[in-house]
């Protein structure tokens, strides 16, 4: 029977440790770590995600500062808000909720975030440092996936990892992190021909493509480790990017959907904010 890589249970364990660290930081410095969240526009799903991150802050004893901007906000206005947060010594992490309205240059705004406060790992500078093996906060979802693999003693070095998806905040940093952990990495994407043939070679498969159940169960190599970073609402629940029904009969380990990667994305963001506060208040 396959090992279930339970992200919810691991997130609770990490949050318990973070609560202790935050209390110690408060006792030592008299300050509380603060994550600033910026929500632009009225996207319902984005508002839900921001609320979940605020709840996670409270669970570990942190504060969150919620900045809400109108749908008509310009790039210049958003950059001005980010610069205020960069300059605010009480703010230790900055999250710009993706996506932003179409008129905004999202990349310019991501890159305006101070490296010391880039706890969601979205800046080009942070990505470049991470890809070169230097210290930087990792993009939250792939960094959370790496924690899941390491905490469950999944062997990475020397394994063939196939990442399906090449987005700037998931697929590309995921591949870089696996490479840094000494995996042999293949990146597949929308232009990849014969996708199934690549997936069938994978010791570790990461679904990060954003298409419901694109990766079929019968493509999975027996004994592979299956990581599904997708979520697509369906019939009161949801499915991921990988066809998981019956996967326990094929894989050696897998992340469920929901309850696998998702909880660890938020917990990683919170953990990196605590780390940023510890550095700032040392």
From Swiss-Prot:
Question: Source organism's superkingdom?
Answer: Bacteria
Q: Which residues bind NADP(+)?
A: 165-167, 190
Pathway(s) where this gene product acts: One-carbon metabolism; tetrahydrofolate interconversion
- Give one Pfam hit by family name: THF_DHG_CYH_C
InterPro entries membership: Aminoacid_DH-like_N_sf, NAD(P)-bd_dom_sf, THF_DH/CycHdrlase, THF_DH/CycHdrlase_cat_dom, THF_DH/CycHdrlase_CS, THF_DH/CycHdrlase_NAD-bd_dom
Would you tell me the Gene Ontology cellular component terms? cytosol
Question: Which biological process terms from the Gene Ontology are attached to this UniProt entry?
Answer: L-histidine biosynthetic process; methionine biosynthetic process; purine nucleotide biosynthetic process; tetrahydrofolate interconversion
Any idea of its EC number?
1.5.1.5, 3.5.4.9
Q: Which reaction does it catalyse?
A: (6R)-5,10-methylene-5,6,7,8-tetrahydrofolate + NADP(+) = (6R)-5,10-methenyltetrahydrofolate + NADPH; (6R)-5,10-methenyltetrahydrofolate + H2O = (6R)-10-formyltetrahydrofolate + H(+)
Q: Which GO terms describe its molecular function?
A: methenyltetrahydrofolate cyclohydrolase activity; methylenetetrahydrofolate dehydrogenase (NADP+) activity
Query: Mind listing the UniProt keywords for this protein, alphabetically?
Result: Amino-acid biosynthesis, Histidine biosynthesis, Hydrolase, Methionine biosynthesis, Multifunctional enzyme, NADP, One-carbon metabolism, Oxidoreductase, Purine biosynthesis
- SUPFAM superfamilies, sorted: Aminoacid dehydrogenase-like, N-terminal domain, NAD(P)-binding Rossmann-fold domains
Please describe the quaternary structure of this protein: Homodimer.
Q: According to its UniProt record, which protein family does this protein belong to? A: Belongs to the tetrahydrofolate dehydrogenase/cyclohydrolase family.
Q: What function does the entry list? A: Catalyzes the oxidation of 5,10-methylenetetrahydrofolate to 5,10-methenyltetrahydrofolate and then the hydrolysis of 5,10-methenyltetrahydrofolate to 10-formyltetrahydrofolate.
The protein in question is named Bifunctional protein FolD 2
Q: Which organism is it from?
A: Acinetobacter baylyi (strain ATCC 33305 / BD413 / ADP1)
């Amino acid at each position: 029977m396959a090992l279930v890589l339970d992200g919810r249970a691991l997130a609770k364990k990490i949050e318990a440790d973070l609560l202790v660290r935050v209390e110690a930081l408060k006792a030592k410095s008299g300050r509380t770590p603060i994550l600033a969240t910026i929500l632009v526009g009225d996207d319902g799903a984005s508002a839900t995600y921001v609320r979940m991150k605020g709840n996670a802050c409270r669970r570990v004893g942190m504060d969150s500062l919620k900045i809400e901007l109108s749908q008509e906000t310009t790039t210049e206005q958003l950059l001005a808000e980010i610069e205020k947060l960069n300059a605010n010594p009480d703010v230790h992490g900055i999250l710009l909720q993706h996506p932003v309205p179409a008129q905004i240059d999202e990349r310019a705004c991501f890159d305006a975030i101070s490296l010391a406060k880039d706890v969601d790992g979205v800046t080009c500078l942070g990505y470049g440092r991470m890809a070169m093996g230097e210290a930087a906060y990792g993009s939250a979802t792939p960094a959370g996936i790496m924690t899941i693999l390491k905490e469950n003693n999944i062997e990475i070095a020397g394994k063939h990892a196939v990442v399906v998806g090449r987005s700037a905040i998931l697929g590309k940093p995921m591949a870089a992190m696996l490479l840094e952990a000494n995996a042999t990495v293949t990146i597949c994407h929308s232009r990849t021909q014969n996708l199934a043939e690549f997936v069938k070679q994978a010791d570790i498969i990461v679904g990060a493509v954003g298409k419901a159940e694109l990766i079929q169960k019968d493509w999975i190599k027996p004994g592979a480790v299956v990581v599904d970073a997708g979520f697509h609402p369906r019939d009161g629940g949801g499915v991921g990017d990988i066809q998981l029904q019956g996967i326990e009969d094929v894989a050696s380990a897998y992340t469920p959907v929901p309850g696998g990667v998702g909880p660890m994305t938020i917990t990683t963001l919170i953990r990196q904010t605590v780390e940023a506060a510890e550095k700032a208040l040392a």
